[in-house]
Amino acid sequence: LKQMRDMGINVPVIGPDGIGDPKTAEIAGNKNTSNVYYAAHFSVDAPATKVATPFAKAYKKAYGKEPSQFTALAYDSVRMIKAAIENENSTSKAAITKGLANLKNFEGVTGKMSIDKDHNPVKSMVSREVIQALHRVDVLIKF
């Protein structure tokens, strides 16, 4: 981002989820992080489901900070495995695999999701805009 902006290239940037890491602003400089967008998995400002806000509040109470999108994904992953075990009534590898493959309308903190035939989660996402590295504007996009 810094090199691009130093070269006078001031077009919007659409990047991967990692571009939202606070280190990006530290490395690129705050002034170079405006007009940058990325798809995020979770936002406390744009809760995807009714379980997102209680999760975020409990996390902040326990750890003194907001959960990151990666924390939210990890939380959902564990809950999805739990749901698969419960749905298949087994802890075997094959049963968990089958349970995950058949997961439908799972209400996670990152969104309501179903697993498609190719084993990909189909769920909402958050479009996030970085503004001077410190602020963000989040919009929940449901699929």
Task: List the model feature ranges, each with a label.
Residues 1-143:
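Extracytosolic ligand-binding ectodomains
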